């Protein structure tokens, strides 16, 4: 997948960064969430965003161009990557003995049991966050990027998602990025009531 970030595709990465940060808020290398946002960007670039000249995301193009060279195991792995779940989730708790995290996709309403017990202490029941899930061998795993939203804005986030649940994927992604921008503004204007930040008529 490195080929889609270098050489002839390097200018495309630059354009994609502008698009992503225009929609989700520009981060600087000294921002607390810089590494998280860069991880979210790379996943979005590789798995969600269509490269105009190709008419598809890099992962889809890579599979189509190289599928005859893949083993069955590699085909399954790449197909799972192409069908990753990028969404806003709510943390519901853990399974017995805390071996898996239970999260619910707020768009599809589906629940997933995620294999990553190391993260269990990073979550509190009711946490709302943007993340990406990958499936491998029938198990779900988180990608590296997260964007946690203030729990005080639960009703706002739930209501906005409810409005567009049955719209297309592009509209879902647009809202996910808009919420990420609101979170970034909330961090930068921490002295302002979050209710004045999370909204489409916000002055901030």
Model-derived features with residue positions:
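Mixed-charge, low-complexity intrinsically disordered regions
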Residues: 1-88, 93-98, 121, 128, ...
């Amino acid at each position: 997948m490195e080929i889609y970030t270098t050489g002839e595709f390097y200018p495309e990465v630059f354009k994609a960064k502008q698009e992503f940060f225009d929609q989700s808020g520009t981060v600087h290398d000294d921002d607390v969430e810089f590494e998280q946002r860069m991880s979210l960007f790379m996943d979005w670039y590789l798995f969600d965003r269509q490269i105009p000249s190709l008419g598809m995301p890099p992962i889809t193009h890579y599979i189509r161009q190289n599928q005859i060279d893949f083993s069955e195991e590699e085909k399954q792995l790449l197909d799972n990557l192409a069908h990753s779940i990028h969404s806003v989730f709510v943390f519901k708790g853990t399974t017995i003995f805390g071996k898996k995290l239970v999260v619910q996709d707020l768009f599809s309403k589906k629940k997933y049991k995620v294999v990553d017990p190391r993260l269990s202490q990073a979550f509190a029941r009711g946490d709302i966050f943007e993340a990406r899930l990958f499936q491998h061998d029938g198990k779900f795993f988180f990608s590296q990027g997260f964007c946690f939203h203030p729990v005080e804005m639960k009703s706002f986030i739930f209501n906005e998602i409810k409005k567009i649940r049955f719209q297309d994927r592009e509209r879902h992604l647009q809202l996910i990025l808009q919420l990420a921008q609101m979170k970034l503004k909330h961090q930068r204007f921490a002295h302002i009531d979050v209710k004045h930040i999370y909204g489409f008529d916000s002055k901030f």
